[in-house]
Amino acid sequence: MSESSIDTLKTMLANLDDAKKYQSLRDVMETLPAPDLAAVFEDLPAEKLPVLFRLCPKDLAADVFAELTPATQQQLIDGLTDTELKAVVDELFVDDATDLVEEMPANVVKRILAQAEPATRRMINELLKYPEDSAGGVMTTELMALRPDMTVAQAMDTIRENGFDKETINNCYVTDSSRRLVGVVSLRALVLAKNTEEPIKDLMDSNVVSVSTTTDQEDVSKLFEKYGFLAIPVVDAENRLVGIVTIDDAISILQDEASEDIAKMNAIGPSDKPYFKQSMWDLYKSRAPWLLFLMISATFSSLVIRGYEDALAAVTVLTAYIPMLTDAGGNAGSQSTSTIIRGMAVGDIQPHDLPRILWRESRVALLCGGTLAVCNFAKMLLFDRIAAPVALVVCLTLICTILLSQIIGGILPVAAEKLHVDPAVMASPLITTIVDTTTLLVYFNIAKALLHL
């Protein structure tokens, strides 16, 4: 039903200037969840954004706004009056409002803060003190806190009275008089409690998994993956409860980290903008420096070839198999690197596992290299009609190349981790250049030894 409603909405937007369509448009919008409405907004030209946003049901407007990309949010803010902007900011959860302030240019930030309530402004400024990629930077302060001496009935009354403005009430956090975190109790436990006079301290779980305000956001997201939480409490250095990180933020973190790693692994500067929201200049800046670096690095391969020109001149057929050998080596190295980086990202592999990594990769490389060499040897003899000694040179090089490539692919991510460099930045872009040069050196030296060049 959602897909058909989206299609209907897009069709109606084509005739947005027809005033009779506005009520029908609002009716369709009321049937759509916030993420689907936000997807429609992303496809609209800037001048139509405020018009459609004003038709949003009041209880949905802030949720739709929070789902938009920063670029679209800025376009929409530019088209809203101060009164309309104030209504949006007041309805945003404080972590979403903080994200908005972090993403906007200074002139827009001044306007946002000017429209925010003093209490909201204080909370935003408090969250902005933490590093952007830390638990403190992504947490929200809108949580449900209870006291251990409360009864179940008192706790339920507190939740009914204050829960509407909280980001989640699935878990309620129990704090002492100094706001130190002492336990957690689920809404389920409160609802199902048979004795409404039972104190919270008898129901709560005192073994609470929490994170510090300075914990890296990627480490926080791993805890969600490990424990299946919907929220994780955040405490300061004195174990005082200062906020929570919710599952929606954890999912966003995982998506951002994955996008960043994929970009880095392919030698592209990461960007938080969608592809079609990036200008040609943005795309150029994210790619050109890496391409230039890799082009310069590739000159090592040219130097190797120039150093063995006599061998190539004597047996020119060797030249024909250089692309196949370097491609096979690069592919094998990339497979190894990607596997190790992924293992390190999910915690399966640690730097001290390097000896085990090399032992496993070596055995896999010999199996893969042997299989490729046998197939290639038969192809060269039967189809290419190449002399057996030359075929032997190529196939021995193929085995050595696969072996060296997978060993290098296993070492680079671990070395990057030891040097406190992102493995995706160091390992993936460099693997092809290193393997190409290594492959050529092995190839020409085997050729010189076996063909007596």
Positions of PLM-derived features:
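Membrane-water interface of transmembrane alpha-helices in multipass transporters/channels
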Residues: 307-321, 384-396
